Regions:
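Sec-dependent bacterial lipoprotein signal peptides
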Residues: 1-19
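Terminal leader/tail segments of proteins
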Residues: 19-144
């Protein structure tokens, strides 16, 4: 009798432990898998699966999966200016925002005022590495 009760109790515990909040988990996974641009204090990361990650550094350098891409002075200046604009928007978002964080709590949606863009519209023509990342650039997030 004790063995039957013990096995029944273990089966109930396993069933309860396996039943998590699937909706919350699904929302979390969907948010994480979206293409996005994360603006941190030292770097802007552009992520879009299955493409490699792009990192923009404060001095305007561009890295693709940790490999630095050679840029001319005009391209580097454009990325440096965009980095500064994104840092200003990040600070404004972090100090003023009451927006909900994403599912992990790491990032907030970046508030870009109407009529302003951190990157020029011809970014993909001027720097070909950005051609496949327009969806990610349209989803800016501020890292906490």
């Amino acid at each position: 009798m004790n063995k039957l009760l013990l096995s029944l109790l273990l089966a109930c515990i396993a069933t309860v432990a396996g039943c998590g909040d699937r909706e919350q988990y699904t929302a979390h996974r969907a948010e994480r898998s979206k293409p996005k641009m994360e603006v941190g204090a030292n770097m802007v990361s552009v992520r879009r699966a299955p493409y490699p990650n792009l990192d923009i550094l404060p001095d305007g350098r561009l890295r693709v999966d940790d490999i630095e891409i050679p840029l001319d002075d005009g391209q580097r200046e454009m990325l440096r200016t965009s980095f500064v604009k994104l840092q200003i928007l990040r600070q404004n978002t972090l100090t003023e925002s009451s927006a909900p964080a994403d599912a992990s709590g790491r990032t907030l949606p970046l508030d870009v005022p109407a009529g302003q863009t951190p990157f020029p519209p011809d970014l993909a023509e001027r720097i070909p590495e950005f051609k496949q990342y327009s969806e990610a650039l349209a989803n800016p997030r501020a890292l906490r």
